[in-house]
Amino acid sequence: MKPSIVAKLEALQERHEEVQALLGDAGVIAEQDRFRALSREYAQLTDVSRCFLEWRKVQDDLATAEMMLDDPEMREMAQEELKDAKAATEELEQQLQVLLLPKDPDDERDCFLEVRAGTGGDEAAIFAGDLFRMYSRYAETRRWRVEIMSANEGEHGGYKEVIAKVSGDGVFGQLKFESGGHRVQRVPETESQGRIHTSACTVAVMPAVPEAELPEINAGDLKIDTFRSSGAGGQHVNTTDSAIRITHLPTGIVVECQDERSQHKNKAKAMSVLGARIRAAEMAKRQQAEASTRRNLLGTGDRSDRNRTYNFPQGRVTDHRINLTLYRLDEVMEGKLDMLIQPIVQEYQADQLAALSAEPE
């Protein structure tokens, strides 16, 4: 391992011990905000610290085994220990490289999840509903909370558009690779000839950031319309103009919110989504600049990003970004998404490692 990397790991190890001591300090415990921040830092440093300590132990074993090679009686055992120590060193160094990759500061944040029906009419809306249910089931398995911010239901089920806030540990980091186009191939229930139709939806995943970190939005740049809500809601539907539509004139971004009965609450929700969308659009521009120099697996939520195809007759799901095909569609639609998410996370990390190794010392 490069001396510069060892030096960096030693510094992180020292910081881990320092933070551990601070967390036991009564003065720090009394300051809730500082205690929380240090607890997060400690959790982030724990894995790399543990892995580095294990690597150091293996290096000691390696040195001991090399010394034993000079002893004829111990040589055979030493060669076996040397082989094991070298294999362990290689594995631990790979783990440490991944742990040292630059962290996306947004990865630990909650996120806004948008699913929109694209081409395919009613069938696209039904599939948007299926996708949203899939993500909701996945959230349940990870003990995340899903709160619908806005829902525009399809005429025959599903959603023309649904926006939800997903809250929990590491939400954005897990879901960010879902942004892009999702295509379905199946026979719609309304299809009497049994023909397979192709429909599409787009998914956009944006980090939910604190208000202080959102781009400044000038009131003069906004066009705000009120209208009567439609869809579920019983006797309260269509009685007041509580639904809100906000248009950000410089970017053309439009957000609607009609889930709450209060116009004030709908406006607050719409503004939080609008801020996240504007920030996401700015980040997408930066990603496109990066993509000109290297492959970019992170989608922008645009329909031109073709992420996956869900083929129901074949029970197949294909991720086109990494050429991964699984014949486990039923499980995927029930929310078992780790089998799709983890391979693309690993591919993304491999790309990051390749970019880092190409940089000069």
Swiss-Prot record:
It comes from the Bacteria. Keywords: Cytoplasm, Methylation, Protein biosynthesis. One of its GO terms (molecular function) is translation release factor activity, codon specific. Methylated by PrmC. Methylation increases the termination efficiency of RF1. It is found in: Cytoplasm. Peptide chain release factor 1 directs the termination of translation in response to the peptide chain termination codons UAG and UAA. NCBIfam families: prfA (TIGR00019), PRK00591.1 (NF001859). This is Peptide chain release factor 1. It comes from Serratia proteamaculans (strain 568).
